Amino acid sequence: MEATRAAFDEAITLRQAKKLIQCMAHEQSFLLLSAPGMGKSEMVYEAAREAGLPCRSLLGTQIAPEDVSGVPRIVGERSVFCPPRILLPERAEPFCLFLDELPACAPDVQKAFYSLLLERRLGEHALPPGTWVVAAGNRLQDRALVRAMSSALVNRVTILHLRVDTVEWLAWAQRTGIRNEIRRFVTAIPDALMRPVPAEPVPFSTPRAWALLSRAFDMAQKSGLLNNETRRALAFGRLSPEDAVVFCALAEEAIGAIQPLEEYFCKPDLLPMGDAARWFILDCIRQFVRDGKADGFKPRVVNRFLRSLSSEHQLTLLADMVAKWGALGADRAMFDLLRKVAAA
């Protein structure tokens, strides 16, 4: 059973999740799960805006059970629970109720959400027809503040596991004004968009981190503060160290627009002259070949490109990938030369 499940990828992109929410969140409640910093909250707000719904949010870590069920007041000989205004506004119009960090809620708070998630009710009060109920949170493996969810809660929602899609994010980044150098960097190194959550609580690269870094650069530049030193401080304060060091080195060398990797194959003269920039492009080409994206090149193009490089750079590209380059038609003589260089 586990092997069968492993053959399928149940995770979907933010764009796919948004369409599902807009399609059926008025009847079925959703729980969005992913690593921190993917942009779940922004996606929910965007989905609600597009549907013309106001979005009201509750942060799971900052509420108590009575914040959900309401507080009692005496009416005649009976006690009546008064629901909170954020969950049940005076005007009976549909809205988007966003329950952020639901998996981080205390067990009593999770129980208070049962009828809200399944029946769209707060005690004797029903949510306005057409109201969305969407929750979000992190997973146990993300080293975030997460509590075990009860089976009763899980059975009341549709759980959507989310994954990062680089093309999707780049389109969003262009629409929202993310800086060109950040978009170029992520285009060249897609893995830099979302790094694994580190074991220690240190900065790491996520879509949110890149977006906030772009905004920080804009503010620093507007105030005349953006230089090499402040760029490094801001980048290392937001990103994974391996991304921050390469990003800053490229920015300081003013590499300019990064060409499609196919262009460097066909026109090696386009490779940047600066050491950091050249190493960066060659590392991207190495990944390009490893992923099988260079399979369409003719052997003469491959060999012309390799011969244009120094022995050191050739060794960098071919190390541990002799079979890959051999399948592309790289000359045997080049491999012999590299063996001599490596043995020297």
Language model segments and positions:
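AAA+ P-loop NTPase catalytic core
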Residues: M1-P65, L250-A344
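Intrinsically disordered regions, especially transient/low-confidence alpha-helical propensity segments
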Residues: T166-W169, P207, A276, V322
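A residue-identity detector for tryptophan
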Residues: W132, W169-W172, W210, W279, ...
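AAA+ P-loop NTPase catalytic core and its hallmark functional loops
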Residues: M1-I189
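Alpha-helical lid/collar subdomain of P-loop NTPases
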Residues: R175-T316
